[in-house]
Amino acid sequence: MKIRRVVTGHTPDGKATVASDTEVDAITIRMLPGTEFHRLWGADEAPTFPDAGSSRSAPAYFPPVGGFRFGVFTVGPDSVAMPKDLDLQVALAELEDKLPGIASRLEADNPGMHTSDTIDFEYVLSGEVWLELDDGREVQLRAGDTVVQNGTRHAWRNKSAAPCRVVFCLIGAHRR
């Protein structure tokens, strides 16, 4: 699935303008069937205005302090199994290639559980998903619900039969 992304910027004389109007393809990962990532915008530092609205470099999935990421991810149902012929090393290499830095945050002994040095703002667009925290609590979220995560250890679990779409904004933060 593609998502349309309209980006504004400034002309040389300071007027607002549409800098780009494009479609962003989903990033899919073989080891995460039913899951999609749309990396819509991001930067590794705070922007300065006026600017032309051009895309900034933001290669890593998680932003550094002062950086940000904006996107949509689709959490596939937990019932959709990984392919039986999956080569784990090849799959991890694909994950690192398509979403740099995310694999190092995932816990091998607890699939999906991860921690990042970010404050995460999430809004559930459609479907339902469970936010699992490391104290054992699970919070069911449905379309219209929001989450603010403050660098917490968590996982997303989709116990339903339908995909769940979530809009997110990650902002890099300090951890003591």
Model-based region annotation:
Residues 6, 10-11, 15-20, 25-27, ...:
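Double-stranded beta-helix
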Residues 27-77:
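Short, well-structured hydrophobic secondary-structure segments
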Residues 108-142:
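A short beta-strand-loop-beta hairpin characteristic of the jelly-roll/cupin
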Residues 56, 76, 130, 138, ...:
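Ligand-binding loop in jelly-roll beta-barrel domains
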Residues 23-24, 56, 70-116, 150-153, ...:
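Conserved short histidine dyad/triad with adjacent acidic residue
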